[in-house]
């Protein structure tokens, strides 16, 4: 899988974000019976200030968040809890942004290793790029089951 990572905050240098992203993305695509070699994703590794600006611009929420995603195309199913349409996907799946301070704070508050939490958020963001969401209870249940299963492949405990 081709992953283009832009490090926009120095805190990220302490983590192997490239390795975490590669493992998380390959596990996600493989779990969904997709060939990781067919796809690409871009990741912006930023700070809370940058992601708050993006969150304001794209979601109208002037606060930091852990991860934002921008799918390259709309793949969401019409039926709540249904699988998105995963055939004929564009090679470029979309873009993610991760905020270091928010991710680190959430990991510490949850007693989770930061790399495990980052892996979870990459899986979560990639699933959004593939058309999954958590707008309804049925959608959230499907997405959480997938995340838990994919993270188990990576040796990451159930985040829920």
From Swiss-Prot:
Top-level taxon: Bacteria
Pfam families assigned to the protein according to its UniProt record, in alphabetical order: YbeY (PF02130)
EC top class named in words: hydrolase
Compartments reported by the entry: Cytoplasm
GO molecular function: metalloendopeptidase activity; RNA endonuclease activity; zinc ion binding
Any GO BP annotation: rRNA processing
UniProt xrefs under PANTHER family: ENDORIBONUCLEASE YBEY, CHLOROPLASTIC
Family per similarity comment: Belongs to the endoribonuclease YbeY family.
Name recorded for this polypeptide: Endoribonuclease YbeY
Source organism per UniProt: Jannaschia sp. (strain CCS1)
Gene name of the record: ybeY
């Amino acid at each position: 899988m081709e992953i283009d990572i832009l490090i926009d905050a120095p805190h990220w240098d302490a983590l192997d974000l490239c390795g975490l992203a590669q493992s998380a993305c390959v596990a996600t695509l493989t779990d969904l019976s997709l060939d990781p070699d067919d796809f690409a994703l871009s990741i912006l590794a930023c700070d809370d200030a940058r992601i708050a600006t993006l969150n304001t611009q794209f979601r109208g929420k002037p606060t930091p968040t852990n991860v934002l995603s921008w799918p390259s195309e709309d793949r969401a199913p019409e039926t709540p809890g249904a699988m998105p349409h995963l055939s004929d996907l564009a090679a470029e799946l979309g873009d993610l942004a991760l905020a270091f301070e928010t991710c680190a704070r959430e990991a510490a508050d949850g007693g989770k290793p930061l790399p495990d939490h980052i892996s979870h958020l990459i899986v979560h963001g990639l699933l959004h790029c593939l058309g999954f969401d958590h707008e309804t209870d049925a959608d959230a249940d499907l997405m959480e089951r997938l995340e838990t299963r994919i993270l188990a492949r990576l040796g990451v405990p159930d985040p829920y």
